[in-house]
C-alpha cells in the first residue's frame, strides 16, 4: 500500500484545492521526470539523491525569497554547486514542479467530466495534416480570410491572472508570480521574443502550459460569443473548462464598448465562418463582405487590448481575398484557384460539352523561405547553390548518405500534399548535390570526378519518387492505385513540423 501513498496525498490536496504543499513533495518531481511512484519508492530506499531532491527544492525557494539572493560568494558556489545560485538550474527544477502540479486540477476536472462517457480517441486528428482536408473542403466556398498573428502577453502578470480563475490556491499563485517575475528580469517584466525563446527552450512543458492557458482563454470567449449568436452549435470544438466569473467577465467586457451583452456583433452570426489555428497563428475565413471582415478585425483587436491587456495593432490581422492572395500557414502557401474542367454530357441523341470551373484549394511549397532554411543549415548558399556540409565530413559514407536521405524523406513526406511538385524537386536536387559535394570533399576530390567513380545506383533513392515505392513493393499494382499514390497525399502521422520547413 505504500506505493499508493503519493496518489492518496494528491487526492487529499485536490479536495481542499491546495497545490502549494505539493511543491515540497518529492514524488511530484519524480512524476515530472516520468519515473512514476513505484520507481520513486525504490530509489528512495537506496538513497535517492538527484538535482530535484526535496532539500534542494526547499533551499532554492528560500533563496529565491531572500532579499540578498544575488549576493553569493564564489567559494560557496564552487563548494555547493546545487545550493549556490544558478539561475538556469534554479528555474529548471522549480518549473518542472510547477508544470506537473498545476496540471493536476485540469486533469482531474477532465476525468470527472468524462465519467460515464465513452472516450473516443481520434489519433489521426493529432496530425498537422489533418487540418488540410478540412481546408480543402470548406475554403473553396469562402470569399475572405483574416490572417491572424496572435499576440504574446506583454506582461507576465497576464499569465498569472489567466490561471487565477482555475487555480484557487493563493499561496501557489503567489509563488508562481514571484518565480515568473524573478526569472524574467528583476528590472524588466516585459516579455520579449528573446526571453520567450530562452524560457520555452529551458522550460518547454511549463511554457507550453502557460501559453496554452492564455490561448484557451482567448478562444473560449470567442467561441462562447459565437455559440450564443448562432442557432447551429459548434460540435467540433474540444472540451473547454468552465471558468469562474466567466459571465461577469463577459459583461465587463461589453461595458467597455458601452454595448449590451445581448447585442451580438453581426459578423459572429455568419454561419459560414471557419477558424483554424496552429501555435500562434490562426486563420478566420468567412463568406462575409470586406466591411464585416474589417469589423471582425477591430473586434479582435479590442478583445485583446481591453480584456487581456495585450497591445495589438491592426497590422497583426491581414484581410485578404482568397482568390487573389495566398495564405502562409503551416509552411504551405495555400490559395483558392479556379480549376477549369470540360465535361461531356449526353441526353438521348444529343451530346454537348459543359465548361465547369469549380474552386480548388492549392497548397504549394514556399521555395524562397525553404531555400533560406537550407542556407541557414549550410546545405546551400543564399541563392540556392548547393555547398558541402563541413560538420559531416568526418562520418562514414554510409552515415552521410543516410542523414541526407533522412532529411529528404522528411521534407518529401511533409510536402506530399502539395499541388505542384516542381519546388520539391528543386529541394531534392539541392540536398543531393550537397551530399555529393560533402562526400567529394571528404575524399579530396571534385563532385564530377566523384560521381564518375561511384555506381549509378549510389544515389538512386534521391531520384525515386513516392509513387515509385509502390511499384517496387507491389509490381502488379493497378494503374489507378499508382495514380492515387502519386497524387496528393496527406500523411496523418506527422505531429510536428520539420525543422527545415519551420520557417515561420
Curated annotation (Swiss-Prot):
One of its GO terms (molecular function) is RNA binding. It comes from the Eukaryota. Pfam families: Intron_maturas2, MatK_N. It is found in: Plastid, Chloroplast. One of its GO terms (cellular component) is chloroplast. The keyword Membrane does not apply. Keywords: Chloroplast, mRNA processing, Plastid, RNA-binding, tRNA processing. One of its GO terms (biological process) is RNA splicing. InterPro entries: Domain_X, Maturase_MatK, Maturase_MatK_N. PANTHER family: MATURASE K. HAMAP family: MatK. Usually encoded in the trnK tRNA gene intron. Probably assists in splicing its own and other chloroplast group II introns. Belongs to the intron maturase 2 family. MatK subfamily. This is Maturase K. It comes from Quercus ilex. The gene is matK.
Amino acid at each position: 500500500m505504500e506505493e499508493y501513498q503519493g496518489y492518496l496525498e494528491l487526492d487529499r490536496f485536490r479536495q481542499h484545492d491546495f497545490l502549494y504543499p505539493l511543491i515540497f513533495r518529492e514524488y511530484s518531481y519524480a512524476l515530472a521526470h516520468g519515473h512514476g511512484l513505484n520507481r520513486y519508492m525504490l530509489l528512495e530506499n537506496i538513497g535517492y539523491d538527484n538535482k530535484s531532491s526535496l532539500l534542494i527544492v526547499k533551499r532554492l525557494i528560500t533563496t529565491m525569497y531572500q532579499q540578498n539572493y544575488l549576493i553569493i560568494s564564489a567559494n560557496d558556489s564552487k563548494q555547493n554547486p546545487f545550493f549556490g545560485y544558478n539561475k538556469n538550474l534554479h528555474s529548471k527544477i522549480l518549473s518542472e514542479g510547477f508544470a506537473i502540479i498545476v496540471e493536476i486540477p485540469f486533469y482531474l476536472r477532465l476525468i470527472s467530466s468524462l465519467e460515464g462517457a465513452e472516450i473516443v480517441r481520434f489519433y489521426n486528428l493529432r496530425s498537422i495534416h489533418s487540418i488540410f482536408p478540412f481546408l480543402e473542403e470548406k475554403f473553396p466556398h469562402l470569399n475572405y480570410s483574416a490572417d491572424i498573428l496572435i499576440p504574446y502577453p506583454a506582461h507576465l502578470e497576464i499569465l498569472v491572472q489567466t490561471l487565477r480563475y482555475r487555480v484557487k490556491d493563493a499561496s501557489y499563485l503567489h509563488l508562481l508570480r514571484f518565480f515568473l517575475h524573478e526569472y524574467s528580469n528583476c528590472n524588466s517584466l516585459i516579455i520579449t521574443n528573446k526571453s520567450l525563446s530562452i524560457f520555452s527552450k529551458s522550460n518547454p512543458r511549463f511554457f507550453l502550459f502557460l501559453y496554452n492557458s492564455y490561448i484557451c482563454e482567448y478562444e473560449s470567449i470567442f467561441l462562447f460569443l459565437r455559440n450564443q449568436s448562432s442557432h447551429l452549435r459548434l460540435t467540433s470544438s474540444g472540451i473547454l473548462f468552465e471558468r469562474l466569473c466567466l459571465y461577469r467577465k463577459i459583461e465587463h467586457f461589453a461595458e467597455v464598448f458601452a454595448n449590451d451583452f445581448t447585442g451580438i456583433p453581426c459578423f459572429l452570426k455568419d454561419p459560414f465562418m471557419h477558424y483554424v489555428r496552429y501555435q500562434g497563428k490562426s486563420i478566420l475565413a468567412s463568406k462575409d463582405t470586406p466591411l464585416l471582415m474589417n469589423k471582425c478585425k477591430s473586434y479582435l483587436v479590442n478583445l485583446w487590448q481591453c480584456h487581456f491587456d495585450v497591445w495589438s495593432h491592426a497590422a497583426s490581422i491581414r484581410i485578404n481575398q482568397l482568390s487573389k492572395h495566398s495564405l502562409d500557414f503551416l509552411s504551405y502557401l495555400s490559395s483558392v484557384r479556379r480549376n477549369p474542367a470540360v465535361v461531356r454530357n449526353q441526353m438521348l441523341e444529343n451530346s454537348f460539352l459543359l465548361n465547369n470551373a469549380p474552386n480548388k484549394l492549392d497548397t504549394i511549397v514556399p521555395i524562397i523561405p525553404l531555400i533560406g532554411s537550407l542556407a541557414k543549415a549550410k546545405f546551400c548558399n543564399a541563392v540556392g547553390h548547393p555547398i558541402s556540409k563541413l560538420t559531416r565530413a568526418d562520418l562514414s559514407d554510409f552515415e552521410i548518405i543516410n542523414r541526407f536521405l533522412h532529411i529528404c524523406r522528411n521534407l518529401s513526406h511533409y510536402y506530399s500534399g502539395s499541388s505542384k511538385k516542381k519546388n520539391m524537386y528543386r529541394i531534392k536536387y539541392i540536398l543531393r548535390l550537397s551530399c555529393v559535394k560533402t562526400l567529394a570533399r571528404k575524399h579530396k576530390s571534385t563532385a564530377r570526378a566523384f560521381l564518375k567513380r561511384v555506381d549509378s545506383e549510389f544515389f538512386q533513392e534521391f531520384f525515386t519518387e513516392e509513387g515509385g515505392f509502390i511499384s517496387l513493393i507491389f509490381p502488379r499494382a493497378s494503374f489507378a492505385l499508382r495514380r492515387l499514390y502519386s497524387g496528393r497525399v496527406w500523411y496523418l502521422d506527422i505531429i510536428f513540423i520539420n525543422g527545415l520547413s519551420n520557417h515561420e
